[in-house]
């Protein structure tokens, strides 16, 4: 994998940044009424795409298409955007090129399951050198004070672990 991509200086120290909580109300109907697809990643999940490679209701990485392409220039799915305008605006407000954009309903799981399902994403596999590094943004939609994301630089080394609280 090439590392000749533009990166943000704010990511240099830890590789991640915690954004401010979103202070605007979001009607739960925006994520509850979306069309979810039967597509599995890890854990007990459901996925509702808002943007995909070609604007279809599917969740594949953009590199799975013929021809394969970088995980950028996603096409908003009109029927989903109409249901979730506030969520879409939250994404668009970042001002970045959006690739896959999905609502992921992940059921609570154990710490052991979280580690078992951990994986290193390879979202830059088709990203041309000299372009911006593909990033992921996570936004917790429901309030669970015990919810957190586990990040590890080395999946086998607990000393590299960071836990990020996920307030709604």
Residue ranges of each PLM-predicted region?
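Non-heme Fe(II)/2-oxoglutarate
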Residues: 1-102
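Catalytic core of non-heme Fe(II) oxygenases with the double-stranded beta-helix
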Residues: 90-168
């Amino acid at each position: 994998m090439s590392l000749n991509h533009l990166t943000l200086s704010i990511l240099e120290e830890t590789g991640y940044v915690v954004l401010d909580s979103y202070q605007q109300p979001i009607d739960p109907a925006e994520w509850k009424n979306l069309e979810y697809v039967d597509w599995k990643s890890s854990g007990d999940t459901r996925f509702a795409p808002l943007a995909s490679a070609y604007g279809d209701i599917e969740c594949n990485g953009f590199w799975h298409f013929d021809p394969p392409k970088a995980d950028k220039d996603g096409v908003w799915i009109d029927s989903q955007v109409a249901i979730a305008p506030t969520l879409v605006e939250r994404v668009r407000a970042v001002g970045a090129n959006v690739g896959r954009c999905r609502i992921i309903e992940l059921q609570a799981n154990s710490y052991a399951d979280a580690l078992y399902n951990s994986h290193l994403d390879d979202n830059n596999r088709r990203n041309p050198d000299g372009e911006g590094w593909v990033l992921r943004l996570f936004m917790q939609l429901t309030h669970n004070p015990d919810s957190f994301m586990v990040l590890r630089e080395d999946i086998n080394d607990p000393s590299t672990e960071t836990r990020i609280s996920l307030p709604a």
